[in-house]
């Protein structure tokens, strides 16, 4: 089904089996503020590496598995079946880095990250710059062979677990003043500090602190690419991660439909199984239909990446996939919680966890409203035929 070949089915099987290993740990995480014991989390990390499910977007030239975009979607889809962020051990470093990393970056950060020895985080978003990054206030001042970085970043996901951060800032001097540039910063560099760590709704094991960079000095070898390239890396990351968001939403919706259907078949109300009630049937039928449509869209978008379709067309298609799949998963979670009734409001219930965790998929990596603007912009410029 879906035209998957033997290699696709094998990577999908491995990912599904691994997700099935993670799912029993959800209750443990839920009972401990979202976190697993360190030794168990480490075993999951090592298992992902062992199975070839780590850094799946990395080419073989840097030690990655060299999977196709479709195969990467298949892996992340299975990870999406797991709550509490436990499948974040299926980490993917930035897809654009191997092409632009200088020798220093390659040896110090890139290769160890692909091997699973280091972890990155992203210091991009600010209080006044979320989906629209053109309003960044963070600055980068060239000072001899160094850059001095200043800025306060919000939602720096997994900062507490990270070894280094990608820091986006506006250049203040030189021929490219006003451009945005991207830098690699070790999290223990003097001047980097956590301002506060707010409590969030989802994936409690991964904190999302506000982090200040105050007079942080880094050598020019920490500049990613050139002073002209900063926004291009962000756009490339958005294309990739929006598709992966869509993939994870497929997995979440599939598990919700499966577990809710099983519950409705067993639950007897008024002398017959709940699944015989037409209103429940309608909710499950709508959910399954929307999942089927979202999966077809997401897989086809991945195939268009593998086929080398124009990047701006891909930008719109990835936005369409994220928009449709994330909103689909939110509707499915809402319906499934309703079918479970009071049980669906208990933390031990899968519908409660997904209802809470899936909400962010319509916000991060560009809110749904931004996706609609991107799609509409490309429609106006290219017409519908090139996009669909």
Task: For every predicted segment, state its role.
Residues 116-124, 168:
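A short, Trp-centered hydrophobic/proline-enriched beta-strand micro-motif
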Residues 135, 188-219:
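Flexible, small-/acidic-enriched active-site or ligand-binding loops
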Residues 64-67, 131, 222-227:
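Cytochrome P450 core scaffold surrounding the K-helix E-X-X-R motif
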Residues 212-236:
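A short, charged helix-loop
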Residues 92-101:
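Helix-loop "lid/cap" segments that line or gate small-molecule binding pockets
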Residues 145-146, 150-195:
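A short core secondary-structure module
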Residues 1-82, 86-87, 103-105, 112, ...:
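Alpha-helical interface subdomain recognition
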Residues 113, 128-131, 155-158, 171-174, ...:
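Short Gly/Pro-enriched turn/cap motifs at secondary-structure boundaries
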């Amino acid at each position: 089904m879906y035209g998957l070949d033997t290699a696709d089915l094998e990577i999908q099987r491995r990912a599904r089996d691994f997700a099935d290993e993670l799912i029993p740990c959800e209750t443990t995480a839920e009972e401990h503020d979202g976190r697993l014991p360190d030794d168990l989390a480490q075993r999951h990390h090592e298992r992902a590496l062992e199975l070839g499910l780590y850094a799946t977007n990395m080419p073989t030239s840097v030690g990655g598995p060299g999977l196709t975009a479709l195969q990467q979607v298949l892996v992340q889809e299975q990870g999406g079946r797991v709550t509490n962020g436990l499948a974040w051990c299926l980490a993917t470093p930035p897809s654009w880095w191997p092409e632009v990393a200088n020798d220093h970056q390659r040896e110090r950060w890139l290769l160890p990250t692909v091997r699973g020895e280091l972890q990155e985080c992203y210091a991009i978003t600010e209080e006044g710059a979320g989906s629209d990054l053109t309003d960044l206030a963070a600055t980068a001042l060239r000072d001899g062979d160094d850059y001095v970085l200043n800025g306060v970043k919000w939602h720096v996901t997994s900062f507490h677990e990270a070894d280094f951060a990608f820091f986006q800032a506006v250049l203040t001097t030189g021929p490219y003043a006003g451009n945005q540039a991207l830098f690699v910063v070790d999290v223990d560099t003097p001047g980097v500090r956590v301002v506060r760590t707010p409590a969030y709704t989802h994936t409690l094991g991964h904190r999302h602190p506000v982090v200040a960079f105050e007079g942080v000095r880094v050598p020019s070898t920490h500049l990613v690419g050139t002073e002209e390239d900063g926004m291009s890396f962000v756009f490339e990351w958005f294309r990739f991660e929006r598709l992966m968001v869509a993939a994870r939403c497929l997995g979440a919706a599939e598990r919700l439909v499966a577990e809710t259907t099983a519950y409705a078949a067993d639950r007897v109300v008024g002398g017959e199984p709940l699944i015989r009630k037409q209103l429940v049937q309608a909710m499950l039928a709508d959910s399954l239909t929307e999942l089927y449509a979202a999966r077809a869209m997401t897989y086809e978008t991945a195939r268009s990446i593998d086929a080398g379709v124009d990047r701006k067309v891909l930008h719109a298609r990835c936005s369409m996939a994220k928009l449709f799949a994330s909103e689909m998963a939110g509707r499915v979670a809402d319906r499934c919680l309703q079918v479970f009734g009071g049980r669906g409001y208990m933390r031990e219930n899968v519908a409660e966890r997904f209802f809470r965790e899936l909400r962010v998929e319509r916000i991060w990596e560009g809110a749904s409203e931004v996706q609609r603007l991107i799609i509409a912009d490309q429609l106006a410029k290219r017409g519908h035929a090139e996009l669909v």
